[in-house]
Amino acid sequence: MRTFGPKWFKQDSLIGEFSEHLGMAVTQHRQAIALQVAKVDAELASKAKSEFIANMSHELRTPLNAIIGFSDMLHIQTAISPEKVHQYSGYIKQAAEHLLALINGILDVSKIQAGELTVDREPLDLPALLSSCLLIIEAKAREKSIAVETAVSPGLPKILGDSLRVKQVLINLLGNAVKFTPERGRIRIEVAPLQRGYAAISVTDTGCGMSPSEVETAMRPFGQIDTAFNKRHEGTGLGLPIAYALARLHGGDLRIDSHKGAGTRVTVILPTIDSIDNQPDSHIH
């Protein structure tokens, strides 16, 4: 005599098996998507690094060729005037300083990615630091007839930071503004206190601007925006990622507001002496 179980038992078993298979299929699908995304990310990272190495090779060759060329001229020419010696040695010094800056940029990125870069925290006069940085870019701005405006809020408290690294951030932002602002353009620098122990330094230019995807690329180490305009300008693509990392190491932030064809505004936020009792990365407005 044959016996049969209840229909609801068979239905529950089928539903259970179906749910189990469906769950496995969903999991496998998610894993496949994750692997595909990881593969694409790895390929993009590899491509970016390859492009960076190719570009960096060109950047390194430029000052090296200048050093070798002017050194050869000093070595070959027997009857050379003191004025020429002074001129050539000046070119060699400039090229060597440029080469050192490139190498330091590579080392900084390596330290940042390895978590080995540290910053000091001491009271700093931000307007004085800004003035010294403006002197560095002044000649280039004048050469392009760029108007540079500054607006510093009175009574600004001292910031807490590493003098060398804060200057590195400011010089990068100012240098980029001059580089990407066309002749007879305008750059405006604003320094103002924020609430709860922070200060903001904003650099706004009337340059070519960036799309959201280009901003994302510019903030990525080894990422460079592939445009004809950028290819006409020297650069390693390390400046903004380093500046962002340094701002975060200080307990601050770096933000970019840019629109294609409408210029760029970069704001770096740094803690002031009022934030000594606050935790880094908190209460940032």
Report each predicted region and the residues it spans:
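Short alpha-helical segment of the dimerization/phosphotransfer core of two-component systems
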Residues: 94-99
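Conserved catalytic submotifs in the C-terminal HATPase_c
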Residues: 120-125, 142, 147-157, 194
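Short helix-loop "hinge" at the ATP-lid/N-box region of the Bergerat-fold HATPase_c
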Residues: 177-178
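Primarily the dimerization/phosphotransfer
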Residues: 36-76, 87
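Helix-loop junction within the histidine kinase core
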Residues: 110-121
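Short helix N-cap motif at coil->helix boundaries in the Bergerat
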Residues: 126, 209-217
